[in-house]
Amino acid sequence: VYKRQDYMYSVREGWVVSKDNISEKIMGVDVSHHNNDNSEGVINWAEVANAGYKFAMVKVAGRSTGADGNLYTDSYYEENIQGALAAGMQVGAYFFSQSMSVEEAVEEANYICDLIAGYNITYPVVFDWETTSGYRTEDLRSNSELRTAMSIAFCDTVKSRGYDPMIYINKYDYLNYVDTDKLSSNYDIWLAWYWNDYYETGEL
């Protein structure tokens, strides 16, 4: 029986999620305006750090999912970066991408790098390209050549700006819709692996 706290600490189907009984594990949080815009109030970063979390991956900006594809900044990115840094945590940043071309991916990379300039960003700057029905990118999901090229363009631009790049992608898309050899041999991968066979107890 696996519980939620075990998800990072197991080996399944040949994929190393982590090692059993690992003592060097580093816990982190993924935050965006969704965490701030709720009824629970302001994030207490001191409490987060005291709970053992060592790093924060902060959503800094994105591109709208509509046809216009406008760039936007996360309304709480500065507050979240400053709060995490003040609590002594390491900070990384990510861009919610809706790029449909290499040129747009480069634009997104420069946009986020401009926003985080001046902050001590020691964790990766991440390309978080996503799609689903109704998104401007919905017809590009299986376009492996373009998705790979956009990922490379974003990462190379981020690297040229002095940051460590990373690619966020779910397991299925990683195995089916990008060139894994080109990406994994050159860039770090933040692999999202969503479990969907929960019992009511929260165990599987």
Where are these regions (language model features)?
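Short, small-residue-biased leader/transition segments that mark boundaries at the very start
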Residues: 1-2
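N-terminal carbohydrate-binding/catalytic regions of secreted carbohydrate-active enzymes
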Residues: 10-92
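Structural recognition of the beta-strand scaffold that forms the well-ordered cores
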Residues: 26-30, 54-60, 90-95, 123-129, ...
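Glycine-rich anion/phosphate-binding loops
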Residues: 73-76, 100-113
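Surface-exposed substrate-engagement region within the catalytic domains
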Residues: 115-125, 129-204
